[in-house]
């Protein structure tokens, strides 16, 4: 095991194959916060959900917090904000209530703890004292569009942006032959094979944000495929070119001298 090592920066997947690994499993998950790219996201009263959950005590968001998003992470952020002293917490969603992605369990407990919800509101700007949203309407095609001229200002002391997470792009950018889909998730076969031979993947990096139970179930299935793949590879008969080189022996006197120093 080699901890505290980021693959995709100094060390790449290509380096792993060079150093003798026969297959690689990517289970990096989605730990990079997605931004909305609207004005005000860099203000001091704004936190990204994944950063807030990692160290909520580091943020000073006041007693009236807006949470943008209605997924499981957004529910965690809302409930954590209440535990940190916020008196009012409101979740905002671009679509209607039927489109909540959080589990019913998470939503029900958030409501019990006092979390409010505003639906069909699309944030267009964050300010130090709140956020500006436009109303959205559902079209015949099922898509929600913003209503021009419907802007409304909602006062808040702090804002948490929790609109899902993305994968770390360096892993893909530095590895030849790996393809992703339109959402930036890794493209794999049913048994977890990516488009690069010997590279397998599973979990959130493939399915999007899911539960730990689902990720573990997929990982077990992919592990079987990896084992079968490695067993199918021809035996490595290449001789070690440095097998017969001399081994330097440190003189005992040098060791004693260093110890005395």
Name each model feature, range by range.
Residues 59-87:
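Rossmann-like NAD(P)H-binding beta-loop-alpha module
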Residues 42-62, 144-209:
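FAD-site-proximal beta/loop scaffold in flavoenzymes
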Residues 70, 93-96, 204:
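Cofactor-binding loop segments of dinucleotide-utilizing enzymes, especially the Rossmann-like FAD-
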Residues 202-232:
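A conserved FAD-binding loop/helix module that cradles the flavin
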Residues 4, 61-65, 86, 120, ...:
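Phosphate-coordination loops involved in phosphoryl transfer and adenosine-cofactor binding
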Residues 1-3, 78-123, 234-252:
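Rossmann-like dinucleotide-binding cores of NAD(P)H-dependent redox enzymes
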Residues 1-39, 124-133, 158-160, 165-171:
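Feature captures the FAD/FMN-dependent oxidoreductase FAD-binding
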Residues 2-4, 47, 116-118, 132, ...:
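General small-molecule cofactor/ligand-binding pocket signal
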């Amino acid at each position: 095991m080699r901890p505290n090592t980021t693959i995709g920066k100094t060390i790449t997947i290509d380096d792993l194959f060079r150093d003798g690994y026969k297959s690689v499993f990517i289970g990096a998950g989605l730990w990079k916060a997605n931004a909305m790219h609207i004005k005000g996201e860099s203000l001091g009263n704004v936190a990204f959900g994944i950063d807030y959950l990692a160290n909520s005590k580091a943020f000073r968001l006041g007693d009236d917090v807006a949470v943008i998003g209605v997924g499981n992470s957004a529910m965690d952020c809302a409930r954590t904000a209440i535990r940190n002293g916020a008196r009012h917490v409101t979740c905002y969603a671009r679509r209607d209530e039927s489109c909540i992605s959080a589990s019913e369990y998470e939503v029900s407990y958030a409501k019990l703890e006092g979390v409010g919800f505003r639906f069909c509101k699309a944030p267009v700007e964050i300010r130090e004292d709140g956020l500006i949203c436009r109303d959205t309407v559902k079209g015949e095609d099922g898509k929600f569009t913003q209503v021009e001229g419907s802007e409304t200002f909602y006062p808040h002391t702090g804002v948490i942006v929790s609109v899902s997470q993305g994968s770390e792009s360096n892993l893909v950018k530095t590895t030849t032959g790996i393809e992703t889909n339109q959402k930036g998730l890794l493209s794999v076969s049913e048994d977890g094979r990516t488009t690069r031979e010997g590279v397998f993947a599973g979990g959130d990096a493939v399915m999007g944000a899911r539960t730990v139970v689902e990720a573990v179930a997929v990982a077990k299935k992919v592990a079987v495929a990896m084992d079968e793949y490695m067993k199918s590879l021809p035996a490595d008969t290449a001789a070690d070119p440095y097998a017969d080189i001399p081994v330097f022996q440190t003189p005992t006197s040098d060791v004693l001298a260093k110890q005395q120093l």
